[in-house]
Every structure is written in structure tokens, then in C-alpha cells.
Amino acid sequence: MRSLLAQGFMGSQRGRRKVALAMVATLGALLAGCGTALPTGDGRTPQHIDITLIGFNDLHGNLEPPHMAHRVQGPAGPVLAPAGGMAYFASAMAALKAQSPHHAVVSAGDMVGASPLVSSLFLDEPTIEAVNRMQIDFNAVGNHEFDRGWRELLRLQHGGCEKFTSREPCRISKPFEGAQFGLLAANTVREDGRTLLPATGIKRFTDGGVTVTMGFIG
């Protein structure tokens, strides 16, 4: 299994939790792969599935390209590249997906919050809708997903136009349909002990009679 990190929004890597989702997903896929590698009993080579794991974090609603170049690691060393913005990011994501029919796309948090005006003015609904079009699987919420409170975070997941902040929701799309990918939060619990959002997510891959189950912990 290959693990690929989209570099456009890796940012400052603010803590170990940012990479926890991708690391656990990688481990889960490897363990799942071990289940398919058992001997067949008749001497045949065991079948397997190649899975590409694509991860990113700290998008922070950066829908537009920045006004400066970013330092990225090129084949010959660091170079300055005029990259960024959702259009470039979505194109890079599509290219990675095209390389593997079996893939999972995960975000390790801070997809929204601390966002530029183009997203924050509309309660980050534009960012959720843009990421919906990219068809990712899960986002493990970070601290900035809670910038407007947990009720507003649930609205971003489930949709709707109920007002939880001083700004009016649904000013672009009415009704706002919410994220079409799962938000995960294993370490955020309600007073009754239930997690605010699902703690885990599962994606299954099937090819040639072989099924691999990949688990994600938010």
C-alpha cells in the first residue's frame, strides 16, 4: 500500500494529532492486507489489493491561491512553487486518484476555521461544498473545527440553516446540505459519555473476490 501526502496544505504540522489519522489508517490497511495474505491451501499465490492512501491537513478554507510562492521539496532540493488554492488542490487530488482505482482520501483536521474571508464570511460553507466535490472519505476534526462551537460543527456535518453564530447561514446555498464525508472525533465526548461525532470510520475495497476493510480513527 502506498501512502501519499498532498503537500499543498501541509502547513506547519501543528502537533502529533494532525498525522494520527493517516498513521492509523496506514496501520489498519496493512493489518487488513495481512488478512488477505494467508496461504490458500492449494499452493496458489495469495491475492491482494493495492490501496493508495491520500492525506492532507490544515486546509483552513484557503479556496483562493495565495499571493506568494511556497517552498516545496523538488527532486533536486527545495524550490519555490506558485501553488495553492482549491482549483490546484483539486486537480492534484484527481491526478493522485487516477493513479489507483482503490484509494482513500482523508483529512487530519483544521479543514475549516481560521479561514480567509472568502470562506469565513459564509461560515465555511463554501469550503465544505468544495471538498464535497473532491469526494474525500473522512476528516478527523482539529481544534479549529470548533472555532464556532460544537453545534455549528454538527451543522457543517449534517447541513441545515439553523443559526448558531452571529452570522446568517445558508447565504450561498439554501438549504446547505452539509458535508458528504464523515467527520470523526474519537476524543470529544458529551456529558453522557457518547462521542460528539463518530469515533471511527470504515471503507471497504473489493477486487477479484478479495475484500480489504480499512479502519480510521478520528
Model-identified regions with their sequence ranges:
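Bacterial N-terminal signal peptides that target proteins for export
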Residues: 4-23
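Bacterial N-terminal signal peptides
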Residues: 22-31
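Acidic, metal/ion-coordinating pockets
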Residues: 34-218
